[in-house]
């Protein structure tokens, strides 16, 4: 039975109890150091940031041949006795009695040499980059954030639902969607008027990859009260930035009988919960990021966890920005959407902590957001955090049928495509709210990584769909 390196870390009684016992380790060689009478071999199995040291001596069967074949990237199986290590770098090490090479790795052509590689280069070898310290640590933190997400909502009685990837509606009304079709691209079926005849397509209508599971989530919230989705979403935006992906994951809770204040409370509690979970359960990886990526990372996250989020209206935020003694690249004016530089100024410099902005102009927000009494703003909210800006966006949903019908017209959206969404307002309509959190943005914020393409296993962006 294989023992994972993670279980050999630390000085707990459970770890100390392994001293003197024979175990089997399997992993990939990181370092080989030949001495006169023995060889140090460090392997890593991905369960933890740390490598584990194995000591091989000439009395191991096939020692000379083995040592000649060992190099970075070789996969091995090692059997031996766990002993206390005299070295400062580790508490325990293995005195090997047998080492077997599982898979060879030619050092002449292996792309991951023992040197610092740029993240841009690592993206070009995404099939190998999980073997690096940074991407391995990102992946473990990403896993912890996903687990904490489910734990947070499950503890609060939310039901996890699966919403469709293929959809016939545009949740955001932005039109930047990937189309799904089985029609012949060179010679698609056409109507007598010469238009593409989507009645001949697989689904009998135009269909797309979803931009959000929200509308479907609302259906279940209006029957089961509290639900959440956690799945992939797609945006066909030609954005080549460090903050945008064409394929990313979204966490989207929907709560019946909840207003905007309930929504803000949930978003704040959620963000604090997942950050605390990671700091408590990924200490080694987080210390790595704090040392090598952002030296103020842990203190920044602790500040978010221990601080009550400021709450302010969009209108108040615009006044702050207009009076700010700072030159912005993008103009500030009531009715315009805030840019990342504005959001970061508010969170980092003015408030000095996370802030939730509310009540945005209705013309810059989605059709489904509840119109406020002033008929100029909607019950929307964005959570802004230092170093990132917006990290969560949500709203109270429009539950009034007549208002929703009017808004579909205002946004030039065909009511017949949203007939089911409108019917929710006909039969037992209730106030309800929800938000969306881009999972990769959360990973980026938690790890301090500069580029969002380095916090998802296989990034999809304009011009790139490799691996």
UniProtKB/Swiss-Prot annotation:
Location(s), subcellular: Cytoplasm
Keyword Cytoplasm recorded: yes
Name listed for the protein in its UniProt record: Asparagine--tRNA ligase
Enzyme class, UniProt record, top EC level: ligase
Catalysed reactions listed for this entry: tRNA(Asn) + L-asparagine + ATP = L-asparaginyl-tRNA(Asn) + AMP + diphosphate + H(+)
Keywords: Aminoacyl-tRNA synthetase, ATP-binding, Cytoplasm, Ligase, Nucleotide-binding, Protein biosynthesis
An example Gene Ontology molecular-function term: asparagine-tRNA ligase activity
NCBIfam families documented for this protein: asnS, PRK03932.1
GO biological process: asparaginyl-tRNA aminoacylation
One GO CC term on file: cytoplasm
InterPro entries on file: Aa-tRNA-synt_II (IPR004364), aa-tRNA-synth_II (IPR006195), aa-tRNA-synth_II/BPL/LPL (IPR045864), Asn-tRNA-ligase (IPR004522), Asp/Asn-tRNA-synth_IIb (IPR002312), NA-bd_OB-fold (IPR012340), NA-bd_OB_tRNA (IPR004365)
Highest taxon in the source lineage: Bacteria
UniProt record similarity statement: Belongs to the class-II aminoacyl-tRNA synthetase family.
HAMAP family reported for this sequence: Asn_tRNA_synth
Complex and partners: Homodimer.
The protein's Enzyme Commission number: 6.1.1.22
């Amino acid at each position: 039975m294989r023992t994972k390196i993670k279980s050999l870390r630390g000085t707990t009684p459970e770890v100390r109890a392994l001293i003197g016992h024979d175990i089997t380790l399997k992993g990939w060689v990181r370092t080989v150091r030949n001495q006169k009478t023995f060889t140090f071999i460090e392997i890593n199995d991905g369960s933890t940031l740390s490598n584990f040291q194995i000591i091989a001596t000439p009395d191991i069967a096939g020692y000379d041949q083995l040592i000649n074949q060992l190099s970075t990237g070789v996969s091995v199986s090692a059997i031996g006795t766990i002993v206390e290590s005299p070295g400062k770098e580790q508490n325990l090490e293995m005195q090997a009695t047998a080492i077997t090479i599982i898979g060879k790795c030619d050092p002449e052509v292996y792309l991951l040499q023992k040197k610092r590689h740029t993240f841009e280069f690592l993206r070009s070898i995404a099939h190998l980059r999980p073997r690096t310290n940074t991407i391995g640590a990102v992946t473990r933190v990403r896993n912890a954030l996903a687990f904490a997400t489910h734990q947070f909502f499950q503890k609060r009685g939310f039901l996890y639902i699966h919403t469709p990837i293929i959809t016939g509606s545009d949740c955001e009304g932005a039109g930047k969607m990937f189309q799904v079709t089985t029609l012949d691209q060179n010679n698609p079926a056409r109507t007598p008027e010469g238009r593409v005849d989507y009645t001949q397509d697989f689904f009998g209508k135009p269909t797309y990859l979803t931009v959000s599971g929200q509308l479907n989530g609302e259906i279940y919230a209006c029957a089961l009260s509290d639900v959440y989705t956690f799945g992939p979403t797609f945006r066909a935006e030609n954005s080549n930035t460090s903050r945008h992906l064409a394929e990313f994951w979204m966490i989207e809770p929907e709560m019946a009988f909840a207003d905007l204040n309930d929504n803000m409370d949930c978003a704040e509690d959620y963000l604090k919960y997942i950050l605390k979970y990671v700091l408590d359960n990924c200490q080694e990886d987080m210390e790595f990021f704090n040392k090598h990526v952002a030296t103020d990372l842990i203190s920044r996250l602790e500040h978010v966890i221990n601080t009550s989020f400021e709450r302010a209206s969009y209108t108040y935020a615009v006044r702050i920005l207009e009076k700010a003694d700072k030159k912005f690249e993008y103009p500030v004016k009531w009715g315009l959407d805030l840019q990342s530089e504005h959001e970061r100024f508010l969170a980092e410099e003015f408030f000095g902590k996370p802030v939730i902005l509310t009540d945005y102009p209705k013309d810059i927000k989605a059709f489904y957001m509840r119109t406020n009494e002033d008929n100029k703003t909607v019950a929307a909210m964005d959570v802004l955090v230092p170093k990132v800006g917006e990290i969560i966006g949500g709203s109270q949903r429009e539950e009034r049928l007549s208002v929703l019908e009017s808004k579909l017209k205002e946004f030039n959206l065909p009511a017949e495509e949203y007939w089911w969404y409108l019917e929710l307002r006909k039969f037992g309509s209730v106030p309800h709210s929800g938000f969306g959190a881009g999972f990769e943005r959360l990973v980026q914020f938690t790890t301090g990584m500069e580029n969002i393409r380095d916090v998802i296993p296989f990034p999809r962006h304009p011009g790139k769909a490799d691996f």
